[in-house]
Amino acid sequence: MSTEEQAEWFEFNQETVEALIEDGSDSTKPHTIEYHFAGDDFDVLEKAAVDAFKAGFEVGDAEELMLDDGGTIFCFDAVVERLLDVDLINADTVKLLAIAQKQNVQFDGWGTYFIES
């Protein structure tokens, strides 16, 4: 993982957390954070899922998706409950980027759901 890539994800994390809070999502309540992984080799992606599980994340079943060009890709989510705390999300990002690099799969960011105050 390059320092530049990590910095870009940290910026994404900051902007996303700020936008959620500005929109009124309750920052005092835990949010379900879904970190996304993708790859074209199911067996390799499965190894990344095992690593994410060992790192403390709940791992969903891998799904096969059809791409617009007719190709296929596999993906899964590594899920954790977190407050909207950039430091915690950045720490998760460091762990998960390392897993993605080790297993040669794509880390594809994260998402969550709005929680009303």
From Swiss-Prot:
Superkingdom as given in the UniProt entry: Bacteria
Predominant location: cytoplasm
InterPro entries, sorted: RraB, RraB-like_sf, RraB_dom
rRNA processing listed as a keyword: no
Pfam families documented for this protein: RraB
Single GO MF annotation: enzyme binding
Keyword Transferase in annotation: no
SUPFAM superfamilies: Hypothetical protein VC0424
Subcellular location: Cytoplasm
Gene Ontology terms: cellular component: cytoplasm
Keywords from the named record: Cytoplasm
Family: Belongs to the RraB family.
Record note on quaternary structure: Interacts with the C-terminal region of Rne.
Listed HAMAP family: RraB
Job description of the protein: Globally modulates RNA abundance by binding to RNase E (Rne) and regulating its endonucleolytic activity. Can modulate Rne action in a substrate-dependent manner by altering the composition of the degradosome.
Name under which the protein is recorded: Regulator of ribonuclease activity B
Organism: Pseudoalteromonas atlantica (strain T6c / ATCC BAA-1087)
